[in-house]
Amino acid sequence: MSKDIRVRYAPSPTGVVHIGNARTALFNYLYARHHGGTFLIRIEDTDRKRHVEDGERSQLENLRWLGMDWDESPESHENYRQSERLDLYQKYIDQLLAEGKAYKSYVTEEELAAERERQEAAGETPRYINEYLGMSEEEKAAYIAEREAAGIIPTVRLAVNESGIYKWHDMVKGDIEFEGGNIGGDWVIQKKDGYPTYNFAVVIDDHDMQISHVIRGDDHIANTPKQLMVYEALGWEAPEFGHMTLIINSETGKKLSKRDTNTLQFIEDYRKKGYLPEAVFNFIALLGWNPGGEDEIFSREELIKLFDENRLSKSPAAFDQKKLDWMSNDYIKNADLETIFEMAKPFLEEAGRLTDKAEKLVELYKPQMKSVDEIIPLTDLFFSDFPELTEAEREVMTGETVPTVLEAFKAKLEAMTDDEFVTENIFPQIKAVQKETGIKGKNLFMPIRIAVSGEMHGPELPDTIFLLGREKSIQHIENILKEISK
């Protein structure tokens, strides 16, 4: 590429990182790392209503958990928070006022609301109409004096070129253009409290920080013409823009909503449930981008190497919780036991299950986990009464050979000494039951599995029986025999 790549992720300090925000950060990160560019983080904290105590630290922690690093941020650079840059914004506000490209507006909220109501009643598209329209210089001066005497604090509006055409070649969408007359009239660049509006401040920040490419969600497309107006007014070259498609719920086909209860949408949720960050990183990287081919499991280094902005999708990205869980399970299965056991310890400790057999239980159930917190329901069998059987399990236990199998296997367990009761000796006892009864296959194994574990599927049966213990295994079999004899 001909120019240095500098991209940014600019969140508000709300604390939570939504999956959509995480994707924005991640695509900027991949783009910068692939091209050997700079990835920076800037905090947009001028909207004090959205400010959350400790929100900035939480944002950065969640990004670090995902596996991202950055070159510049408020941690290492001064004035990387918008609240620290108010003097800079004021400098350019004053410049635009002096050049007649912006003006102070004294119209009140009540007057704006009344005008909007009138326009809507007349079937007109709501827009701001310059309050000074048709005034002579004397009338304008008198109007301003009257408003200031009434204590009305002005906003500052950018004077829009209504005949201008604002267009750009989008990295994702292709050519896009807006007419200046269709963006709602002269718009506010500085609020009454002296703070800049988003579309003004972001231009000053991106120019000052030499941002080369702005990669963000397509909900920002409507903001882009306003930002181009500011670039034009200040005589600056705009960066390249790329607007990623919406993320939709794969089940509803609609835009992902915080009300969708069938999905986990915040990075903090994945951290708390014990997903591996590598799995979440991998999944998010494929939301609206793919490297081609059939493979879906990639390391961070592979994703950096493969990332190609030309393969960003023009179609909405489907968020599929089941696919994420499949991917997460693959990562957990292939992770080393020590890593997963360390992640499982807090869950086990809270449940009072951090026993001498805890690590073996984690090893046993690791292949089944989608998230590490599942170690608790998966191991309920070992720490609670025998579970209620499902209809399908009850159906299996009505087989006429079931009592024969269970009585024979119970006798084998009762005959074993404590020293003999080890994992490698359990399977031969099952085979001995087969030899004695002539019953084999699922008619042999399924009744034993259901009687011992209360489940039709699970880890290797000898492992389950050993960890459950000889006495508890015998007790479970006796309980089932009583149940099926009724």
UniProtKB/Swiss-Prot annotation:
Name of the top EC class for this enzyme: ligase
Pfam families noted in UniProt: Anticodon_2, tRNA-synt_1c
Entries under Gene3D superfamilies matching the protein: 1.10.10.350, HUPs (3.40.50.620)
UniProt binding sites for ATP: K258
Superkingdom of the organism of origin: Bacteria
Motif 'HIGH' region boundaries: 11-21
Function summary: Catalyzes the attachment of glutamate to tRNA(Glu) in a two-step reaction: glutamate is first activated by ATP to form Glu-AMP and then transferred to the acceptor end of tRNA(Glu).
Designated name of the protein: Glutamate--tRNA ligase
Source organism (scientific name): Streptococcus pneumoniae (strain CGSP14)
Lineage: Bacteria, Bacillati, Bacillota, Bacilli, Lactobacillales
